[in-house]
Design a protein with these regions (language model features):
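Hydrophobic, aromatic-rich transmembrane alpha-helices
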Residues: 124-129, 303, 307-348
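Membrane-interface alpha helices of multi-pass inner-membrane proteins
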Residues: 191-210, 214, 244-247
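Transmembrane alpha-helix segments characteristic
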Residues: 143-144, 342-373
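Conserved small/polar residues in nucleotide/adenosyl-binding loops
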Residues: 378-385
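Aromatic- and kink-enriched transmembrane "portal" helix at the membrane-lumen/periplasm boundary
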Residues: 106-114, 144-170, 200-201, 205
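Transmembrane-helix motifs of polytopic, lipid-linked glycan transferases
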Residues: 112-142
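Membrane-lumen/periplasm interface segments of specific transmembrane helices
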Residues: 241-326
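Short hydrophobic/aromatic helix or loop-helix immediately within or flanking a transmembrane segment
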Residues: 70-111
Length: 385
């Protein structure tokens, strides 16, 4: 209950439901959700249940305006977006239908959906903060919360109906819960692995972007426990968690494949669509893809991008100073431990988690160097995570 109340308070305080006060990003992708909600609002259907638009251009915001104005549309004009499952489109479509019972104005429903999406993101963040509190104390939890509340990119993006940022935290939360239950009981119940499976499946059904990031962050808390506990036992749990997470990804791919069979009418057509969507993200066949090396991608991520990751009024902090401050903090901790003649190994867990937090978004930048290199949104938002 406290988490829910705080999530509501933070959403209202930071005006996250307003595109005018907190901004937005990637409205082009959001049109797919608006198209799907408009379709369901008017009791229309199409094979496969994909998201889509009623215009020729995938990014045409006319779909959003038609949704807001409750404009009648023809089912023959619907273009399905078959490059992902589109679970978020169906979920928001159902929620929109419920809201329409007592709110006929599309613009009002849109604002409500933005607020709900933001509250879910804050709720997930607060649960992570609770885990951080238990591991490292209240100051660390407060720092984590501030890293979200005062981060420009998540503040703009948490309302986005396409990206659904709160689902990005589900695999990490599943990993944290697994660790908490295991440390309390001394063993890992089977349902903890099932939650990891479900978390990764749900996230991937809302989009496979940053898939490597989610898988790494899912394991981060287990790596922390491995560094400070029974390493053989925790290694075994890490392996089982990895299988559960990959199983969730495979299940999402299976759901996508079945949708494709329904839409295209054959397994061959669905397979061609699936493989084409995946390879276009990592090959030069996509118009957005740039022929860049891994070194160029890493240089862009760590050196070239100077978008603010934190903003406190006129004061902004970018990635390079943030890394420098963190390294300085580790150095001071090492010095204090050395002076007190305490084992330096106590910092192994936090250090590994920090390294994984940097490596997680970088892994996707390398795998999908095409979009990550040309699209500043991906780079900056991943850095905030």
């Amino acid at each position: 209950m406290v988490v829910v109340v705080l999530a509501v308070v933070l959403t209202v305080w930071r005006h996250n439901g307003s595109t005018y006060l907190t901004g937005f990003w990637d409205n082009g992708s959001q049109t797919l959700v608006f198209g799907r909600m408009l379709q369901m609002q008017q009791n229309q259907t199409s094979p496969g249940g994909f998201m889509g638009v009623y215009t020729q251009d995938w990014s045409d915001e006319q779909n959003r305006y038609w949704y807001r104005d409750n404009t009648p549309v023809s089912p023959q004009d619907f273009q399905a977006y078959t490059h992902q499952t589109g679970l978020q489109g169906w979920a928001f479509g159902v929620l929109n239908k419920v809201l329409s019972v007592f709110e006929d104005r599309g613009e009002a429903r849109e604002i409500i959906l933005y607020n709900i999406n933001s509250m879910l993101f804050y709720a997930a963040t607060l649960l992570v903060c609770l885990a951080v509190w238990r591991a490292w104390g209240p100051l660390s939890a407060l720092a984590w919360l501030c890293a979200v509340v005062f981060a420009p990119w998540p503040q703009r993006g948490m309302k986005d109906l396409y990206w659904c940022l709160w689902t990005w935290l589900l695999p990490a939360l599943a990993g944290l819960l697994l660790c908490a239950v295991t440390r309390r009981r001394g063993k890992t119940p089977w349902w903890c692995y099932l939650l990891v499976f479900a978390a990764c499946m749900v996230r991937c059904m809302c989009g496979f972007e940053f898939i490597s990031t989610f898988l790494i962050l899912c394991e981060a808390s287990l790596v922390y426990c491995w560094a400070g506990g029974d390493r053989r036992a925790w290694l075994r749990r890490m392996i089982c968690t990895g299988f559960a997470a990959v199983g969730g990804v495979a299940a999402a791919l299976g759901a996508w494949f079945i949708q494709g069979v329904i839409y295209f009418g054959s397994a061959a057509g669905s397979w061609q669509n699936l493989t084409g969507a995946v390879t276009s993200r990592v090959s030069l066949t996509d118009d957005m893809v740039s022929d860049v090396s891994v070194a160029q991608v890493l240089t862009r991520y760590f050196v070239e991008v100077d978008e603010p990751l934190l903003q406190f009024g006129p004061l902004t902090i970018t990635l390079k100073p943030l890394i420098a401050v963190t390294l300085l903090g580790f150095a001071l901790c090492l010095a204090v431990l050395a002076l007190r003649k305490k084992p330096l190994a106590v910092l192994a867990g936090p250090a590994l988690v920090w390294v994984l937090s940097l490596a997680a978004p970088v892994s996707w930048m390398v795998l999908s160097k095409a979009h990550a290199y040309v699209c500043l949104l991906y780079t900056s938002d991943a850095a905030d995570d």
